[in-house]
């Protein structure tokens, strides 16, 4: 079940390209290897360690993103500067995407190196890389959606407040007119 080393790097790079950025490109591992996926329980300890380190980096990344987002929202609450908030959210979204891509690139590079050193594990590595890449792409879509939803929520809250003010004062003006017109 060995994939030739020269094809291995190419497949890994095509897979990486499919799972980075805001793309929704589907990657079909079966189209490349034409084999049934090996059991992931057969993964060598070193390969499991590489994947565990990646998981720890990803978890730290998500914790930091959550803290940064909360801080940005608190800053809006304190400073009341919408323009700075929206700009900061845009920058944070771009930074999050870049950090995610950097992490997956580092992970895929380490998998390529490992696979070139251990050709007998290449099919297994391709299977793991495909599963991890697809999962991280789905999760990053959710992370990026948080940025969009927070901005939309703030904009909607501001719009709702303005509509409430307008509606309330229109009602007050109307009630006042009706009151005074009923006096005489």
Region annotations inferred by a language model:
Residues 108-184:
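Membrane- and interface-active hydrophobic/amphipathic segments that mediate membrane binding, fusion
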Residues 1-120, 130:
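Extracellular, luminal, or virion-exposed ectodomains of exported proteins
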């Amino acid at each position: 079940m060995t994939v030739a080393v020269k094809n291995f790097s190419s497949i890994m790079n095509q897979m990486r390209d499919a799972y980075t950025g805001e793309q929704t490109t589907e990657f079909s591992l079966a189209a490349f290897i034409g084999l049934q996926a090996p059991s992931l329980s057969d993964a060598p300890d070193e390969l499991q360690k590489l994947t565990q380190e990646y998981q720890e980096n990803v978890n730290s990344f998500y914790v930091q993103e959550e803290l940064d987002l909360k801080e940005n929202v608190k800053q809006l609450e304190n400073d009341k500067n919408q323009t700075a908030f929206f700009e900061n959210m845009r920058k944070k979204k771009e930074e999050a995407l870049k950090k995610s891509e950097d992490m997956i690139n580092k992970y895929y590079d380490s998998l390529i190196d490992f696979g070139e050193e251990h050709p007998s594990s290449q099919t297994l590595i391709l299977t793991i890389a495909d599963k991890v890449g697809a999962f991280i792409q789905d999760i990053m879509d959710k992370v990026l959606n948080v940025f969009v939803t927070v901005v939309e929520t703030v904009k909607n809250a501001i719009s709702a407040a303005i509509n409430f003010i307008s509606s309330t004062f229109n009602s007050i003006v109307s009630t006042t007119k009706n009151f005074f017109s009923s006096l005489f």
